């Protein structure tokens, strides 16, 4: 397994619309394993393939258990997701490995139902609510070139742009 480089905003790569996965082979399995290792090392709960430069419609989500541990066997590998149903509305404070250090409230659906394939091309149905539903929406947005900061109000977006400029200045002076 290998750690992959996470692409950061404002890279144009993050605006790429990802392509459907058609080969469910050992290369795909390795990419998923590398994504998981990268996500855990970066202390994330979700990662879309485009965030590591792979323009493929696949993502992983691994929510921590009550003990705070993210067990590999609990990792959801979601490939070629399709929306079946969405319900309700919830505000959730989100962050993103591609937008490090910035967190903001975003409105999402409270419940979602998707169809997807696993690493073996088996079709699955998943119903989710709360944090898992939010994470699924956040990661599927990445597959469509959308970032959570795109969903902010004008005021919150200006705050984000200001904080980003300040962060970039600090990094230049290091």
UniProtKB/Swiss-Prot annotation:
Binds 1 Fe(2+) ion. Fe cation binds at residues 96, 138, 142. Pfam families: Pep_deformylase. It catalyses: N-terminal N-formyl-L-methionyl-[peptide] + H2O = N-terminal L-methionyl-[peptide] + formate. Gene3D superfamilies: Peptide deformylase. Keywords: Hydrolase, Iron, Metal-binding, Protein biosynthesis. CDD domains: Pep_deformylase. The active site is at 139. The keyword DNA-binding does not apply. GO terms for biological process: co-translational protein modification; translation. Its cofactor is Fe(2+). SUPFAM superfamilies: Peptide deformylase. Its EC number is 3.5.1.88. One of its GO terms (molecular function) is peptide deformylase activity. It comes from the Bacteria. Removes the formyl group from the N-terminal Met of newly synthesized proteins. Requires at least a dipeptide for an efficient rate of reaction. N-terminal L-methionine is a prerequisite for activity but the enzyme has broad specificity at other positions. Belongs to the polypeptide deformylase family. This is Peptide deformylase. It comes from Helicobacter pylori (strain J99 / ATCC 700824). The gene is def.
